[in-house]
């Protein structure tokens, strides 16, 4: 992904993390609470098999849609 799109995507991931703060269900591996920013970044990495910076530009809109899905479906 080009630098401009990667920068935009990182900001969107941060905004999604802000939105999900306190909304993720509890998990025994995270007794002090879950990190919503890491959750979003890890979900993106798992779905696209690459860090957000390494996803092709052609999938930018697909990544945006997936982040929106994560916001609507905290898990």
Where are these regions (language model features)?
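Positively charged, phosphate-engaging catalytic surfaces used for nucleic-acid and nucleotide handling
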Residues: 1-75
């Amino acid at each position: 992904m080009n630098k401009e799109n990667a920068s935009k995507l990182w900001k969107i991931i941060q905004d999604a993390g802000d939105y999900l703060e306190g909304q993720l269900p509890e998990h025994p591996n995270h007794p002090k609470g879950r990190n919503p920013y890491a959750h979003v970044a890890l979900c993106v990495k798992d779905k696209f098999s690459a860090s957000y910076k390494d996803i092709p530009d052609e999938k930018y809109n697909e990544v945006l849609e997936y982040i929106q899905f994560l916001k609507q479906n905290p898990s």
